[in-house]
């Protein structure tokens, strides 16, 4: 089975269709793209955002204060908080244009956002963190919710 390629100048609609087809095809072959999508998400995070986040963490007295500073700096969706010892990240809307371009985007697409959070918090805390997708807008939920753990 051939997955194909996409032109580097493809429109966002063509990109969305390609990604969705890729995820659906690989999933049907029992190949799951979780790691690949998470790496892609990590690439979407700017080095400047990481630098700012590290500075905010350095001047914070605790995780709750750090998350409030990230919210004020508009890093991470503006809705980060602690619940039951985990960092909870909530998006009230989908920030990515790709899934909006096609109907029935493969739910694995949101591993991209999980990768974004994974890179952000792993870089700031200088250790690997665990990111769990609780639910997403692509999944039909009213908001995206991610849990970040293993950061302490």
Residue ranges and their predicted role:
Residues 128, 139-143:
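Coil-to-beta-strand transition motifs
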Residues 1-108, 130, 151-152:
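N-terminal accessory segment detector
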Residues 132-137:
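Short, solvent-exposed loop/turn elements at beta->coil junctions and helix N-caps
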Residues 108-126:
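Active-site helix/loop of acyl-thioester processing domains in fatty-acid/polyketide metabolism
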Residues 143-152:
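C-terminal edge-of-domain segments
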């Amino acid at each position: 089975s051939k997955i194909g390629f996409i032109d580097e100048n493809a429109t966002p609609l063509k990109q969305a269709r390609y990604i969705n087809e890729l995820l659906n095809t690989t999933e049907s072959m029992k190949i799951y793209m979780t790691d690949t999508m998470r790496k892609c998400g990590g690439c979407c995070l700017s080095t400047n955002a990481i630098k700012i986040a590290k500075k905010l963490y350095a001047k914070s007295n605790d995780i709750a204060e750090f998350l409030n500073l990230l919210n004020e700096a508009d890093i991470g969706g503006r809705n980060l908080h602690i619940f039951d010892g985990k960092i909870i990240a909530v998006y009230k809307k989908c920030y990515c244009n790709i899934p909006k371009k096609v109907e029935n985007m493969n739910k694995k697409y949101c591993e991209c956002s999980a990768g974004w959070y994974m890179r952000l918090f792993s870089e700031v805390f200088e250790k690997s963190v665990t990111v769990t997708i609780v639910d997403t807008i692509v999944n039909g939920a009213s908001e995206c919710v991610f849990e970040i753990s293993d950061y302490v």
